[in-house]
Curated annotation (Swiss-Prot):
Protein task: F(1)F(0) ATP synthase produces ATP from ADP in the presence of a proton or sodium gradient. F-type ATPases consist of two structural domains, F(1) containing the extramembraneous catalytic core and F(0) containing the membrane proton channel, linked together by a central stalk and a peripheral stalk. During catalysis, ATP synthesis in the catalytic domain of F(1) is coupled via a rotary mechanism of the central stalk subunits to proton translocation. This protein is part of the stalk that links CF(0) to CF(1). It either transmits conformational changes from CF(0) to CF(1) or is implicated in proton conduction.
Organism: Vaucheria litorea (Yellow-green alga)
Record localization: Plastid, Chloroplast thylakoid membrane
Keywords recorded for this protein, A-Z: ATP synthesis, CF(1), Chloroplast, Hydrogen ion transport, Ion transport, Membrane, Plastid, Thylakoid, Transport
Protein's UniProt name: ATP synthase subunit delta, chloroplastic
Keyword presence, Membrane: yes
Origin: domain of life: Eukaryota
Subunit structure of this chain's protein: F-type ATPases have 2 components, F(1) - the catalytic core - and F(0) - the membrane proton channel. F(1) has five subunits: alpha(3), beta(3), gamma(1), delta(1), epsilon(1). CF(0) has four main subunits: a(1), b(1), b'(1) and c(10-14). The alpha and beta chains form an alternating ring which encloses part of the gamma chain. F(1) is attached to F(0) by a central stalk formed by the gamma and epsilon chains, while a peripheral stalk is formed by the delta, b and b' chains.
Amino acid sequence: MTNKLLSIKIADPYAEAFFQLSLSLYIKNNDPDLFYQLIFDIQDFLKLLKETPELDNFLKNPLNSNILKKNILNKIIENKFNLQTINFLNLLIDKKRIDTIQTIGKIFLEKAYEFVCIKFVEVWSTIELSQKQQENLIQKINILLGPIFSEPSVQFYKIQLTLMLDTNLLGGLIIKMGSKIIDLSLRNELQQLGKKLDITI
């Protein structure tokens, strides 16, 4: 079993547990805002780790005690995150699973996005997309995905874009939706042409 598959196998039960907790709080309190708050918390925490590698490395370091990790973490997030999220992160520290939080968070968000009909789409481009270009892209993705048929109405997915720059593309876009990748980059077109002409690009 590869490290990635092992990480997913370890992470999935924790992601599912937090997802079920989020749903139970939503249903019990009839409060969708609380459900969305937990989603936003995980989004923000993953972003925090990405932007602060020092914190990420500190939490992953087995030489740091659980108490120290929780003290540092709680000082950073106690006034920003919901108590349920904080308790969950502390649990991961106690279970020595905080090092898999990126995988846990990603799986949780996929489950949550699917529940609320949100598609998390990653887009790589050579230049920043304008608001109009983003709106046009969302429309095209919705056409590609098709409508959701649910009684008593038909609706479309809510598309959440994560935009990233990659100058190596030369032009065009790469779109990733779950395990599906749509490569519309000029680099890919040149590579395909190169294969036909037996040229390495």
